[in-house]
């Protein structure tokens, strides 16, 4: 696995409460420092405003703090270098013309640590860097797509192909999404994060090298097959008749 820019597509018929919970956890869990973290939301215009309102309200309730504090909801970036990367991308988003809805700063009371408030941008176009490049922090970009075809076009437009999710109640939309999305893992009505040890893990395009981790595929990747013939019968002629 070599990077990701994972999207959640939210269609007009989606359960918005479930979608918001999934996006929230996928984006801000582990401070967004997961290869499968949600960093893009591609939403239908009929429901985008309601979805964004939910996401902003949930993000603003997150309590920042030490990972050793059980009352904390989200910890810091892993180190100063990564914190600087995240803050630089927030600056890029502002410069590109995206609308900062919440977050984007380090709280004044937390200058001692590499903390970043949960950050949500709206009005993000597929040409913007914050839409295309991996940030690896608690930053979410929201983009409007008028149809499933357009949503898939936007989702597939980046160089990465790790994981994507869709929220919809339409089975035809689900199957079209599964067939056409260019990622190694797909989710339906659940977060982009998470995996199972018995299932292959990995991506397409610049995300991976073509092989998968875990499951039988992972075993095959990390091992070599050796064919062994042993004649334990004590009969020399038996091996000649094989």
Which residues does each PLM region occupy?
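ALDH superfamily catalytic-core signature
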Residues: 1-125, 188, 237-240
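Conserved C-terminal structural/oligomerization subdomain of aldehyde/semialdehyde dehydrogenase
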Residues: 9, 63-64, 74, 90, ...
């Amino acid at each position: 696995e070599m990077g990701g820019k994972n999207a959640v597509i939210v269609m007009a018929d989606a359960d918005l409460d479930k979608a918001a919970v999934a996006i929230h956890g996928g984006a801000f869990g582990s401070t967004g420092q997961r290869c499968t973290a949600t960093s893009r939301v591609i939403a239908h215009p009929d429901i985008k405003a309601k979805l964004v309102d939910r996401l902003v309200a949930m993000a603003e309730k997150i309590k920042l703090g030490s990972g050793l504090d059980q009352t904390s909801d989200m910890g810091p970036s892993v180190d100063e270098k990564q914190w600087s990367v995240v803050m630089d991308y927030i600056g890029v988003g502002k410069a590109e013309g995206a609308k900062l809805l919440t977050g984007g700063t380090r709280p004044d009371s937390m200058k001692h640590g590499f903390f970043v408030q949960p950050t949500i941008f709206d009005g993000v176009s597929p040409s913007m860097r914050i839409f295309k490049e991996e940030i690896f922090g608690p930053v979410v970009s929201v983009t409007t797509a008028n149809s499933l075809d357009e949503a898939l076009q936007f989702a597939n437009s980046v160089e990465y192909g790790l994981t994507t999710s869709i929220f919809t109640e339409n089975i035809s939309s689900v199957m079209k999404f599964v067939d056409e999305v260019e990622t190694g893992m797909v989710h339906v009505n659940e977060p982009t994060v998470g995996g199972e040890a018995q299932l292959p893990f990995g991506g397409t395009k610049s995300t991976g090298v073509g092989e998968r981790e875990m499951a039988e595929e992972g075993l095959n990747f990390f091992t070599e097959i050796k064919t062994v013939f042993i004649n334990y019968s004590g009969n020399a002629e038996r091996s000649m008749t094989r």
